[in-house]
């Protein structure tokens, strides 16, 4: 008798991702002559980020099951945000569960959560910084994240509410981070599948009270917004939003390529952006070039919003002699003699 359908589903999702990782990190010894001695590198290490919740515990269990069969080392990391009383003890419990699954290395990392961008964004920034550092420290080639299709739907709605562009509507990528470090195997699986997999394997899970706290935007969306949409529109809203994310990502990727190819054609010999040539481009392509130029000048990508780029765009499409535009990171955009100059102020 095979595993529970939910367990089979999570294992298959992880197996596919691990196969991709193996292909990407295969040792380059195949081209060496057989009579030339050479040392093979150690098997790749894949870490799972685990909060102890159902999604990440299911992911950890699937990684622990699949990795040895593929000759991959598997470890686990939990991040203690220190936002709740006893969080350090819970983090230690999670590490114990990861050890019980057979994962090694395992580690609990305590972080200090700042205030920039609100509590959710600050916690996310601290968490990813800790995971990046852990991956470098342990020499991991990838870190698995337990985001599900439900998380993807929530992300799309949050982007829509902010009035963001198509890139925000594309949600979370299956592969992201420097060098493709972060992998999200569960983006095609719903949250209930992960929870059922934990139940079928008798895995203890921890339900973070913050996930039910209406003080947090994502929590309100999860417990009030999405149920209201499904009540008004019928079942299938989550699936439709996740599908929208993928279609939007395909379009956004194509526009990014177009913008990258067009950028060289709108710069003069000195590398400055020519306003007349920018004006001739489609708005979606032009704004991507402007955003890229602002980031290259030092504007933090996470603080550079659509409204900032729209203001810079008006220097090209609605020129009336207006002054310089101040952007995040002390970057200034200014039109000078038919050229657009974006630089540190």
Swiss-Prot record:
GO-annotated cellular components: cytoplasm
BP-aspect Gene Ontology terms: tRNA modification
Catalysed transformations (reactions): cytidine(34) in tRNA(Ile2) + L-lysine + ATP = lysidine(34) in tRNA(Ile2) + AMP + diphosphate + H(+)
Enzyme Commission code: 6.3.4.19
Keywords, alphabetical: ATP-binding, Cytoplasm, Ligase, Nucleotide-binding, tRNA processing
SUPFAM superfamilies linked to this entry: Adenine nucleotide alpha hydrolases-like, MesJ substrate recognition domain-like
Enzyme category, top tier: ligase
GO terms assigned for molecular function: ATP binding; tRNA(Ile)-lysidine synthase activity
Compartmental location: Cytoplasm
Binding locations of ATP: 51-56
A Pfam family the protein falls into: ATP_bind_3
Function comment: Ligates lysine onto the cytidine present at position 34 of the AUA codon-specific tRNA(Ile) that contains the anticodon CAU, in an ATP-dependent manner. Cytidine is converted to lysidine, thus changing the amino acid specificity of the tRNA from methionine to isoleucine.
Protein family (similarity comment): Belongs to the tRNA(Ile)-lysidine synthase family.
Domain remark in the UniProt entry: The N-terminal region contains the highly conserved SGGXDS motif, predicted to be a P-loop motif involved in ATP binding.
NCBIfam families attached to this UniProt entry: lysidine_TilS_N
Protein name: tRNA(Ile)-lysidine synthase
Species per Swiss-Prot/TrEMBL record: Streptomyces avermitilis (strain ATCC 31267 / DSM 46492 / JCM 5070 / NBRC 14893 / NCIMB 12804 / NRRL 8165 / MA-4680)
């Amino acid at each position: 008798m095979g595993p529970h359908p939910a367990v089979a589903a999570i294992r298959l999702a992880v197996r596919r991702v691990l196969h991709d990782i193996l292909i990407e990190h295969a040792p380059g010894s195949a081209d060496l002559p057989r009579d030339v001695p050479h040392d093979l590198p150690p098997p790749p290490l894949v870490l799972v980020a685990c909060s102890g919740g159902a999604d990440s515990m299911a992911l950890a269990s699937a990684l622990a099951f699949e990795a040895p069969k593929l000759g991959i080392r598997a470890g686990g990391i939990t991040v203690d945000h220190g936002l709740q009383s006893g969080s350090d003890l819970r983090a230690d419990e999670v590490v114990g569960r990861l050890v019980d699954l057979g994962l090694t290395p395992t580690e609990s990392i305590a972080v200090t959560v700042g205030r920039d961008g609100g509590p959710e964004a600050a916690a996310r920034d601290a968490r990813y910084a800790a995971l990046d550092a852990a991956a470098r420290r342990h020499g991991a080639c990838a870190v698995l994240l337990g985001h599900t299709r439900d998380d993807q739907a929530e992300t799309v709605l949050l982007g829509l509410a902010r009035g963001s562009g198509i890139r925000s509507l594309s949600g979370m990528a299956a592969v992201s981070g420097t060098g493709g470090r972060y992998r999200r195997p569960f983006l095609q699986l719903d949250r209930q599948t992960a929870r059922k997999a934990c139940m079928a394997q008798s895995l203890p899970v921890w339900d973070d009270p913050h996930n039910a706290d209406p003080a947090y935007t994502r929590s309100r969306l999860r417990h009030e917004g999405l149920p209201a949409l499904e009540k008004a529109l019928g079942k299938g809203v989550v699936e439709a939003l996740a599908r929208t994310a993928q279609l939007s990502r395909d379009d956004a990727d194509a526009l990014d390529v177009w913008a990258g190819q067009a950028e060289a054609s709108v710069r003069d010999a000195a590398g400055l952006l020519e306003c007349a040539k920018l004006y001739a481009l489609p708005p979606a392509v032009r704004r991507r070039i402007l955003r890229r130029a602002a980031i290259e000048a030092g504007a933090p990508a996470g603080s550079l919003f659509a409204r900032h780029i729209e203001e810079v765009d008006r220097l090209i499409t609605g020129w009336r002699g207006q002054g310089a535009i101040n952007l995040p990171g002390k970057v200034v955009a200014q039109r000078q003699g038919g050229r657009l100059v974006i630089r540190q102020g």
